[in-house]
Amino acid sequence: MAGTNSLGAGPDTPVPSKDTGFTPGDDTWTQMKNMFSILTGNMTEEGKEQFLLARDIRNEENDCKRCEDQRDYLIKYSPIIIRFLQDNIRQLGGDISSHNIHCRRCTQRQAGGFDPQYGIRICANAMKDQGHLEDTMAHEMMHAYDHLRFKLDWTDNLRHAACTEIRASSLSGECRWAREFFRRGQWKLTQQHQECVRRRAALSVMARPACKDAEHAKQVVDEVWDSCFRDTRPFDEIYR
């Protein structure tokens, strides 16, 4: 998910307070033991979170280095990022490039976030491959474009939040059929794109402090859906 979220990235070391099935340790034997506990159903959900956190801490340097290398490649060679979104952001007086696209380890389970003061944060430990990174960068760059063009109120206006989430999910490529079908197990053949955009926009709105609950998030998304889904600026159409 994206938007102006506070993305945690701390040095916490997982220490189980009870028997969760997770055993701390970075050696091969301990890793095999933890994997066996997961495969046999002997690790609780809390234990799985501890396992993932330990893995992310262990791989942090490599994850961030890979993310930065792929980020720099995409900025140089990806048409949607370098020649289009980046250029349109520049035309509005902004600048999104490697100096403010930060690859970090995140403790929240999301792909990235945008903050008008900070720039873009990519959760390096959540990136599955270069294609996933490209979609995430495009999503967050759409937020940057909307912030500059429409002067969004990120703090209190849920309609603004819903609109930019609809546009970012629709235009970034993250809701194209192949990604939904093969990565997320969403197997519908009709209205798949629209349902993906609605679902992801509502989840992002629901994470904001001003949103009461899931029903409130859905209501706000529905209120702005028609105008925001049809608005494909700066693109001529949804092409990914």
From Swiss-Prot:
Membrane topology qualifier: Peripheral membrane protein
Chain sites annotated for binding a divalent metal cation: 139, 143
Domain of life from the UniProt record: Eukaryota
Location of the protein in the cell: Mitochondrion inner membrane
One Gene Ontology cellular component annotation held by this UniProt entry: mitochondrial inner membrane
One GO BP annotation of this record: mitochondrial proton-transporting ATP synthase complex assembly
Keywords linked to the UniProt accession: Hydrolase, Membrane, Metal-binding, Metalloprotease, Mitochondrion, Mitochondrion inner membrane, Protease
Region listing for Disordered, in residue ranges: 1-27
The EC number(s) this enzyme carries: 3.4.24.-
Residues annotated as catalytic: 140
Molecular function terms, GO-annotated: metal ion binding; metalloendopeptidase activity
Family listed: Belongs to the peptidase M76 family.
PANTHER family assigned to the protein according to its UniProt record, in alphabetical order: MITOCHONDRIAL INNER MEMBRANE PROTEASE, MITOCHONDRIAL INNER MEMBRANE PROTEASE ATP23 HOMOLOG
Role description: Has a dual role in the assembly of mitochondrial ATPase. Acts as a protease that removes N-terminal residues of mitochondrial ATPase CF(0) subunit 6 at the intermembrane space side. Also involved in the correct assembly of the membrane-embedded ATPase CF(0) particle, probably mediating association of subunit 6 with the subunit 9 ring.
Protein name stated in the entry: Mitochondrial inner membrane protease ATP23
Gene name, Swiss-Prot/TrEMBL: ATP23
